[in-house]
Amino acid sequence: IINNAVVFLPAKNLLYDATKDKGSRLNGNKIQTGNNTIVNGSRILASESQNSSKLWRNTPPAIERHFRSSLAYRLCLVAEGRFDGMMTLRPTWEWDVAAGNLICTEAGCDVKTQDGGNPLYNEKIPKMNGMIAGNPILVDNLLSYIK
């Protein structure tokens, strides 16, 4: 269980933090995820490789893809509502996403692994099967597209 989280981007002067059951903040101000639930046209943070047809049940959805290299920062941007969601459909080290996971969930997001499970931490192999985050309905809708 993650109880406290901080993601600091000193070059941007951005400090995201969260405490379990007490919400998420950006530079001390409460943040909340967006409310878009429609996959097509949604603004999703993902790498170019996520467009590969082998990852999707049919054709990839028509998302507006954006990229930031840091998975923690992607999660924080979704938490503050600047993007509708984020996804990485490849194995993900837990230390890259643990803080962002709590910041996201405390801002109202649902965070799931690529197979729809809840992320687990402190596992023997500290890697999880991808990650998808956004408001709960959008996450469910995105998961319905994934193989």
Question: Can you describe what each PLM-predicted range is?
Answer:
Residues 1-27:
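DPxDG-like acidic metal-binding loop motif
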Residues 32-147:
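An extended, acidic
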